């Protein structure tokens, strides 16, 4: 399936979906995403990238598995702090693959590249709405996002 297979699922589903890795990804569980409201932002990195060109790079699958297990637990518990730690583990795996460091943000509990990484967008998770909103106001390339979308 390559990288980024989950992106269409995000558009079709509302809430937070936790996937199990296998031959074909399987939905483990889905829950509403209310606990994420006011905590997330995107940063546009303006870094050109070729995601398919990086699909066969070496990866630390043990670290990726630990990040996934930590994220699953965090979503199950609705824990922003645990989810931030899981996102930070995923980012550590991205750095080991050679991705560029992302800028720090005050009040951010975790950040990482979205999708297959290497550029494009990065997700920033904040402990409080005020910190998220300050981050969004700090640059034109930052946008607040919420766990639900409206398709018109």
Annotate the PLM regions.
Residues 2, 6-116, 123-152:
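C-terminal nucleotide
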């Amino acid at each position: 399936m390559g990288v980024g297979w989950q992106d269409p699922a995000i558009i079709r589903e509302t809430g937070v979906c936790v996937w199990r890795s296998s031959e074909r990804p399987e939905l483990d569980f889905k829950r509403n995403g209310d606990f994420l409201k006011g905590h997330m932002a995107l940063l546009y990195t303006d870094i050109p990238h070729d995601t398919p060109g990086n699909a066969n790079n070496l990866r630390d699958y043990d670290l990726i598995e630990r990040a996934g297990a930590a994220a699953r637990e965090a979503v199950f518990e609705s824990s922003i702090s645990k989810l931030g730690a899981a996102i930070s583990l995923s980012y550590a795996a991205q750095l080991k693959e050679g991705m560029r460091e992302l800028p720090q943000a005050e009040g951010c509990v975790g950040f990482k590249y979205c999708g297959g990484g290497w550029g494009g967008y990065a997700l920033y998770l904040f402990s409080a709405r005020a910190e998220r909103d300050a981050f969004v106001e700090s640059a034109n390339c930052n946008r607040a996002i919420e766990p639900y979308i409206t398709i018109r």
